[in-house]
Swiss-Prot record:
The keyword Secreted does not apply. This is Centrosomal protein 15. It comes from Homo sapiens (Human). It is found in: Cell projection, Cilium. GO terms for cellular component: cilium. Pfam families: CEP15-like. Keywords: Cell projection. May play a role in ciliary assembly. It comes from the Eukaryota. Its main location: other. Transmembrane segments: none annotated.
Length: 128
């Protein structure tokens, strides 16, 4: 009977050791989980900060680019704008004639007399 009693005491001590070790491991797991949550929150904060910084830098770069573009390519002078407008109006006027010619449905759109007229117009423009 004493041997059973001694074995019972030994098993009870072993049980206490196992329970104690289990509690210690559970505490370590909780601590590690808490550390992981803290680290993850820190990383998330770092990512958000970096994102905001990058967004700010991108806006600054775009503003600088826009500023440089206006300095490099200022708005054209009114004479140039007028010339460009007249050019495109002329192009739009002659598109149907050239289109028919290019499709093979009409003769060359400018006759010799039109060429003389065009030369006179150019000379008149140059004299102004």
């Amino acid at each position: 009977m004493t041997s059973l009693f001694a074995q019972e005491i030994r098993l009870s001590k072993r049980h206490e050791e196992i329970v104690s070790q289990r509690l210690m491991l559970l505490q370590q797991m909780e601590n590690k989980l808490g550390d992981q949550h803290t680290e993850k929150a820190s990383q998330l904060q770092t990512v958000e900060t970096a994102f905001k910084r990058n967004l700010s830098l991108l806006k600054d770069i775009e503003a600088a680019e826009k500023s440089l573009q206006t300095r490099i390519h200022p708005l054209p002078r009114p004479e140039v704008v007028s010339l460009e407008t007249r050019y495109w109006a002329s192009v739009e006027e002659y598109i149907p004639k050239w289109e028919q010619f290019l499709l093979g449905r009409a003769p060359y759109p400018f006759a010799v007399e039109n060429q003389n007229e065009a030369e006179n117009t150019i000379q008149n423009e140059a004299q102004r």
